[in-house]
């Protein structure tokens, strides 16, 4: 089987939006660096609640303006779109602020702790006529399009079983273990949850066991998802153990394996189902590697703005809400309450 080349958007073909950055921390640093290296998108302004942080960020990335407040940032007439990269607990507060100022908004994943809050926010943004998009960047990567083409061409059969791991010993990253961060399921686990949805759709049943910390934060989860059509997914999510972060699909005719780590620009193999997994491998050999892959979503975002869209066809509002319902169910079943409830 010859594996297809990805159908990717030329970043030079879309409008160069002027971006305002809310939450100029580490993930925003990665995002802005990536879009400046690989796209025509430009961050032009920022603000921060932490003294000096916005000034340092602006100096690093060559931003034109630093505002004294987030309210002033979203009101800036020379900003077209807002990128929200604060703690999860603040995502919707600032996303709503951007929408109410008439700005399109890209919000870091996960959008919220709460599926119902996300649903309400998306309805508000749609009514306002602006694009609101969760930054589930994996959906926009070349490897994801290679998989889409295989599905569209009927090359790999019907998915029967999906397995994915995101397990990395992150006990040293303090923010992952606080309610403001959302916990391991919401911060790390949202990747395998969303990838399962990408491949299998939304589940009809969710079964989870796991471990929580003395403070009630989730540390490790073992998740089985069942689907109305009889297939199932198995997810392992951990902030204490380290295993390869791969994703594998067993179909009626083949096995598809996404390389480690499956959520960045990487490769995939399509194999037969014998013991030795004979088949073909596709590798992403572009210059956009690692977390520079965050840049792809920005180009698609700009394209959707130019088309007048209020939702992303590759990762819809309904997709975000469905994934948050799974994350909520996992936390409830293992006794973790990352929102502090």
PLM features: residue spans?
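Predominantly a Rossmann-like dinucleotide-binding segment in NAD(P)-dependent oxidoreductases
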Residues: 138-209, 214
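Active-site loop of classical SDR/Rossmann-like NAD(P)-dependent oxidoreductases
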Residues: 285-299, 315
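C-terminal helix-rich "cap/oligomerization" subdomain common to oxidoreductases
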Residues: 1-13, 81-83, 228, 300-341
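Rossmann-fold dehydrogenase core element
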Residues: 120-138, 157-164
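N-terminal Rossmann-like dinucleotide-binding module
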Residues: 1-61, 340
């Amino acid at each position: 089987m010859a594996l297809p080349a990805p159908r990717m958007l030329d970043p030079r073909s879309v409008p160069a939006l002027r971006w305002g950055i809310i939450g100029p921390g580490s993930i925003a640093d990665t995002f802005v660096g990536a879009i400046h290296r690989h796209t025509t998108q430009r961050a032009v302004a920022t603000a921060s609640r932490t003294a000096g942080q916005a000034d340092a960020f602006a100096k690093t990335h060559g931003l034109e303006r630093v505002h004294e407040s987030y309210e002033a940032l979203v009101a800036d007439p020379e900003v077209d779109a807002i990128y929200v990269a604060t703690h999860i607990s603040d995502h919707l507060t600032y996303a709503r602020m951007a929408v109410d100022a008439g700005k399109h908004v890209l919000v870091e994943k996960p959008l919220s702790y709460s599926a119902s809050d996300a649903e309400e926010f998306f309805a508000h943004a749609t009514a306002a006529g602006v694009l609101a998009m969760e930054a589930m960047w994996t959906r926009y990567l070349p490897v994801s399009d290679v998989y889409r083409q295989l599905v569209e061409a009927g090359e790999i059969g019907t998915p029967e079983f999906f397995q994915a791991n995101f397990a990395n010993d992150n006990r040293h990253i303090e923010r992952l273990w606080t309610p403001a961060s959302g916990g391991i399921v919401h911060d790390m686990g949202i990747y395998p949850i969303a990838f399962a949805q990408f491949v299998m759709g939304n589940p009809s049943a969710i079964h989870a066991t796991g471990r929580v910390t003395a403070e009630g934060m989730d540390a490790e989860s073992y998740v089985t998802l069942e689907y109305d059509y009889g297939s199932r997914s198995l997810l392992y999510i951990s902030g204490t153990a380290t295993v390869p972060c791969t994703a594998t699909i067993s179909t009626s005719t083949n096995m598809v394996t996404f390389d480690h780590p499956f959520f960045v620009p990487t490769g995939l193999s399509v194999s037969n189902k014998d013991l030795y997994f004979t088949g073909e491998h596709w590798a992403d050999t572009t210059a956009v590697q690692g977390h520079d892959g965050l840049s792809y979503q920005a180009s698609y975002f700009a394209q959707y703005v130019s088309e007048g869209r209020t939702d992303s066809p590759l990762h819809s509002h309904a997709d975000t809400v469905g994934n948050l319902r799974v994350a909520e169910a996992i936390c409830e079943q293992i006794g973790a309450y990352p929102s502090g409830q």
